[in-house]
């Protein structure tokens, strides 16, 4: 009775360790290592379990470019593993291999005489595809584990892997639709360009085309006249400024010349002998 709480405690510890991992995804080897730490005794008695866990985990990383497991998928795998361990503890830990040898050597009708009261050691696996009355009996611990693990896949679908695959398909569909739209738009633009080129090259013109050309010609003439007027105004302004500037410089030069001439006369008159 105490084994179930113990298994649940181990699974909770595993979930806690996975949640504390710094990176968002883990490798299958890391998952196997964590399981091996907590379930070393189970792996020792059933060495084939690691291979089966790795095989099932590889299905969850097919769509991942780095072949890594999301934390949620890793927790789902651990949950399925713990469910198998809890529901079939006798099968996975203490089944006598001699019984299985006898089973393989016996016919189907002799199964009840071989196992007698120990027939409960073999789990009965129900298939969702069949009715509740149609069951099958597993012939070995490995088959029981694999079957139970496969059955658990119906209960813990790889949600993240599934949604990633679905969204990638949706994204590819949208990309193809967008590319198709772009090609359609490009072809339409090319057709319009060709039509415009052909209409320009046509010698016969409609009255509307003539009016349009006249309007464009008048607007271009107006723009040219406006540009010429603006340039002439700017040039006249520049010239007037230059004239004023030259006049000021000339006045300053004349004033300086007169001042120097007057001062030189005064100096010469002072230096004459009396």
Swiss-Prot record:
Q: Which residues form a coiled coil?
A: none
GO cellular component labels: cytoplasm; meiotic spindle pole body; membrane
Subcellular localization? Membrane
Query: What is the protein's membrane topology class?
Result: Single-pass membrane protein
- Domain of life assignment: Eukaryota
One GO biological process from the UniProt record? meiotic spindle organization
Explain the consequences of disrupting this gene: Leads to meiotic defects.
Q: Where are the transmembrane segments?
A: 238-258
Q: Per UniProt, which keywords does this protein have?
A: Membrane, Transmembrane, Transmembrane helix
> What is the name of the protein in this document?
Uncharacterized protein C1739.04c
């Amino acid at each position: 009775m105490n084994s179930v709480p113990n298994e649940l405690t181990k699974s909770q510890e595993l979930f806690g360790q996975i949640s504390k991992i710094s990176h968002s995804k883990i490798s299958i080897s890391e998952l196997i290592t964590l399981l091996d730490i907590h379930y070393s005794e189970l792996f020792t008695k059933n060495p084939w379990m690691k291979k089966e866990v790795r095989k099932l985990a590889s299905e969850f990383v097919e769509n991942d470019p780095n072949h890594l497991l999301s934390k949620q998928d890793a927790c789902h795998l651990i949950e399925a593993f713990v469910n198998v361990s809890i529901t079939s503890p006798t099968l996975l830990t203490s089944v006598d291999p001699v019984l299985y040898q006898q089973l393989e050597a016996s016919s189907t009708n002799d199964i009840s005489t071989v196992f007698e009261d120990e027939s409960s050691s073999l789990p009965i696996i129900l298939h969702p595809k069949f009715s509740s009355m149609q069951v099958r009996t597993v012939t070995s611990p490995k088959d029981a584990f694999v079957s139970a693990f496969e059955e658990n896949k119906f209960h813990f679908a790889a949600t993240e892997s599934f949604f990633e695959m679905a969204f990638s398909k949706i994204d590819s569909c949208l990309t193809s639709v967008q590319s198709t739209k772009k090609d359609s738009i490009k072809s339409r633009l090319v057709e319009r360009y060709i039509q415009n080129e052909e209409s320009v090259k046509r010698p016969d013109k409609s009255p509307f085309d003539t009016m349009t050309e006249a309007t464009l010609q008048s607007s271009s003439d107006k723009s040219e006249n406006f540009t010429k007027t603006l340039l002439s105004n700017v040039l006249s302004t520049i010239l007037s400024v230059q004239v004023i500037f030259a006049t000021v410089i000339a006045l300053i030069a004349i004033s300086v010349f007169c001042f120097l001439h007057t001062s030189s006369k005064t100096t010469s008159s002072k230096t004459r002998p009396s």
